[in-house]
Amino acid sequence: MRCLRPTLLLGAIISACAAPPSIVTSRPVIGILAQPSDPDLGGPETSYIVASYVKSIEQSGARAAPIMWNSSDAELSAAFSQVNGLLLTGGHISRHSGYSNSTFKLLRMAQAANDAGDFFPVWGTCQGHEQLAQFGSGQQEPSILKPTAGTEGLIVPLNFTEHASSSRLLSAASAEVMSTLSKHKVTINLHSLGALAADMTRSGSAEAAFYRVLATNTDSGGSEFVSLMEGRAYPFYTSQFHGEKNAFEWNQGWELNNTAQGAEAHTAEAVAAMQYLSSFFVSEARKSPHVWLAE
């Protein structure tokens, strides 16, 4: 393998001659950052994780471990050291919240770990995708996200970019999976903000240097937003759409409001395509050497 000169990118030294990581565990644990409960529901403040995220991870052969959003720095570090990957879920949390602060602390840990040769993958869905997009800008403020129109309940096929077929995430996907994702209404969007493709691919920008855009979609106002991307130098993966919902959530507003559109999201092909993405992430987590201390 040709060995290139190490390159300075966003403060990280990246060596192109590093050997690809291999599988080191058959018992991966995915840390999921729990969110604060909705104060409008009343009662004491608690934390929660939507069950479909846990089910999706378990379906792909991993275990899920909650990481509390209000953990101390020491507790976040201890949790990070024991899990093999991090899942950032969807939600509607302010970027000025304690949850968002914990998110960025964990992402900095993941970046530092990978820089040090400690392989650690991250997946972000919807809000998690948006947080990872922001992280790629190199700063927590100001927000790089823009409003999207008509994307609450939008179920559409993906528009793949020229990078999709050669990406780490999709290069091993079957022709059937790629066809399902690109030709059928299977990706479930539930968002009012997004990372616009123009911003994430602008030449010379920190975002374009950090991420490779794999797929986009267009909102009702004609704005093209990023739907799927992966880190160029880090095992970070993001989807604006909710892949966990196809197999595990039923009779939700996004399908009841448009039953014809929602029906295709539950086909066997749709479920298989989303499980491919989840299983890929878990396969990445199997390369992490972190050890769950309860075993």
Residue ranges and their predicted role:
Residues 235-239:
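Catalytic His-Asp charge-relay segment
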Residues 2-227, 233, 243-295:
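N-terminal beta1-alpha1 cap of cysteine-dependent amidohydrolase-like domains
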